[in-house]
A protein has these predicted regions:
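Short, positively charged and aromatic/hydrophobic N-terminal segments
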Residues: 9, 13-23
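Local sequence-structure signature of Cys/Sec-based thiol-disulfide redox active-site neighborhoods
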Residues: 39-75, 152-166
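Polybasic, lysine-rich low-complexity intrinsically disordered segments
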Residues: 3-7
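Catalytic cores of nucleotide-enabled group-transfer and carboxylate-activating enzymes in metabolic
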Residues: 46, 83-85, 101-104, 135, ...
Length: 166
């Protein structure tokens, strides 16, 4: 067996590379899983997490993203996962407006336009959990004041949040 080379270390995740094959331990620890299960008790309707990957483009990040999504989905029977290849499944990618990888679409009873590009770990992980809850319940956790401000907008708004690795 080839000698492993450590590729990177994060707070709760270690990736080991064996001649180009990514082998990973669990991303979520037991405490995280317990907390997410509690949060997922709020889920009403099914949610589909659509992962767009590509083996040649950002392969390590795509594998990590898919693993994280599968771990999260495993915490509720109301969450399913569909993995698509950006190059092969172009029509589906275009329908979702996805043009880069790794990408994650959070799709509930309707498509709220929630997309994550990159791996939603660190501070973005709580946003992923919130997005799943919103897609399932149809109710974002917003104050009445925020809802009134949003209702006053004259037209659609495209909000993009950028973050750096933590």
């Amino acid at each position: 067996m080839p000698k492993p080379k450590k590729t990177r270390r994060e707070a709760s995740h270690t990736s080991i590379m064996f001649d180009g094959i990514l082998s990973s331990m669990a991303i979520l620890n037991a405490r995280d899983e317990e907390e997410v299960r509690k949060q997922f008790q709020q889920l009403n309707d099914p949610v589909k997490l659509v992962v767009f990957s590509q083996s040649l483009a950002a392969a390590d990040l795509c594998a990590e993203n898919e693993q994280l999504v599968r771990e999260v989905a495993g915490l509720s029977d109301k969450i399913s996962v569909e993995v698509l290849n950006l190059a092969i499944d172009r029509e589906r990618a275009e329908a979702y407006g996805v043009d880069q990888v790794p990408a994650l679409v959070v799709d509930g009873a309707r498509d709220y336009g929630i997309r994550f590009y990159g791996v939603p770990t660190g501070y973005e992980f709580s946003n992923l959990i919130d997005a799943i809850i919103v897609a399932s319940t149809g109710e974002p956790a917003l104050t009445d004041e925020t809802k009134a401000s949003l209702a006053a907008l004259a037209g659609p708004v495209d909000i993009k949040v950028f973050s750096t690795p933590t």
